[in-house]
Amino acid sequence: MTKLHLTYYTSYYANYKNIPKDFLCVGISRFIPETFKYSNYNNFIWNKDNFLAPSIQLLSDIKNNKIDEDEYSKRYITEVLSRVQSYTGFETLAEWLVSFDNELAQQQTEWKAVVFMCYEVPSDFCHRHLLKKLFNNYYKIPIEELVLNKVNAKTT
């Protein structure tokens, strides 16, 4: 199993204000909520070219019922894996995550965890759940959905 400095979670934008301020929130959606564009959230980062986000075409196909969740899942994984090297220079998602984690550790920030965020609530089908499964099952890197009562119990 890959050893990381920080703990990694997934969550959704509507949950942002409940997330501890010492958790770095990383937007992994194709677009971000308007409130995030004009606010000074010190613990939120987002890149409009985010290689972890589904393509506009993939989003359109699922929203217009041209594909089902199984097809979306296959295409999303294929998209992300094909973009890793061109967007990051790394061969695998695991290598990218280790580098990202090391970079945060070298910055000597007070971050206790990283939260990958998008729009959908935990019960909805979403690419962040696919990303979490990919890290957990394929790379053996533990990432789980953020459950705040568990987190608050650990930090108090």
Where do the protein language model's features map onto the residues?
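Residues lining hydrophobic/aromatic ligand-binding pockets adjacent to catalytic sites
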Residues: 1-156
